């Protein structure tokens, strides 16, 4: 094919859609031209390889889900606890009607392929796993890597990490604690840090059934407030763009 034909085949015009672009203050009916995967200006009469009628639809950048459990040990546990979720009415898994899709299954805890397909149908292009254990990071990344279409990343959990709590309990200097946070982010290939019931998950191992914000951990004698403040300061000094992701105290 000649160069002109290749340009034609790689070009798309999205017509009649409501274009929303908050970054540039755009909220109007407008056509969008695409060539080689990039938005370009097309002449209204220019021939294109494909035209999409987006009447009644919103045209905008892909959605980003900052908190979605899509990888790691908790997903496998959910699938084990929901065997009935893998099949509809106990029938074999139906083959997808879309020729671009491979067979997958699940609704409450879907397989990786189904996760990517369902997100794409909703207009999302990125999702982030917010609860990755450092020891489980390799598995979490491999599972997310098997999820099609979606860009992905994860936040590593440190609020009840035993070594982190030990450093606080021993009164180690802040630079040492900060460096441990930075090392954990790097080693686990995380994009940020999350705490879930800070200190409380560890405290439960010592039969401490609740841990309020200013209540001391039964073993390590540190409080959730200290944990949160230390991690927030560490992330700020490390220059991590995403702030500390917090799941509050005594929540399920």
Positions of PLM-derived features:
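Mid-domain alpha/beta scaffold segments of enzyme catalytic cores
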Residues: 133-180
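Active-site mouth loops of central-metabolism enzymes
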Residues: 89-111, 158-178, 221
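Short, Lys/Arg-enriched N-terminal segments with co-localized hydrophobic residues
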Residues: 1-8
């Amino acid at each position: 094919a000649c160069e002109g034909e290749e340009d034609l085949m790689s070009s798309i015009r999205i017509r009649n859609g409501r274009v929303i672009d908050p970054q540039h203050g755009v909220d109007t009916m407008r056509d969008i031209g695409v060539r080689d995967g990039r938005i370009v200006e097309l002449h209204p009469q220019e021939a294109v390889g494909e035209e999409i009628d987006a009447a009644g639809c919103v045209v905008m950048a892909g959605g980003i889900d900052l908190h979605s459990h899509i990888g790691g040990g908790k997903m496998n546990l959910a699938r084990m606890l929901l065997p009935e979720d893998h099949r509809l009415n106990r029938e074999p898994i139906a083959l997808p009607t879309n020729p671009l899709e491979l067979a997958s299954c699940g609704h409450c805890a879907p397989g990786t392929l189904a996760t990517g397909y369902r997100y794409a149908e909703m207009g999302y292009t990125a999702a982030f796993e917010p609860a990755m254990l450092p020891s489980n990071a390799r598995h979490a990344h491999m599972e997310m890597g098997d999820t099609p279409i979606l860009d992905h990343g994860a936040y590593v959990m440190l609020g009840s990490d035993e070594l982190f709590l030990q450093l606080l309990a021993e009164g180690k200097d802040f630079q040492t604690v900060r460096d441990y946070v930075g090392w954990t982010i790097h080693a686990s290939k995380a994009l940020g840090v999350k705490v879930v019931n800070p200190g409380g998950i560890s405290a439960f191992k010592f039969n401490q059934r609740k841990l309020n914000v200013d209540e001391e951990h039964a073993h390590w004698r540190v409080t959730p407030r200290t944990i949160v403040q230390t991690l927030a300061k560490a992330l700020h000094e490390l220059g991590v763009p995403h702030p500390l992701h917090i799941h509050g105290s005594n929540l399920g």
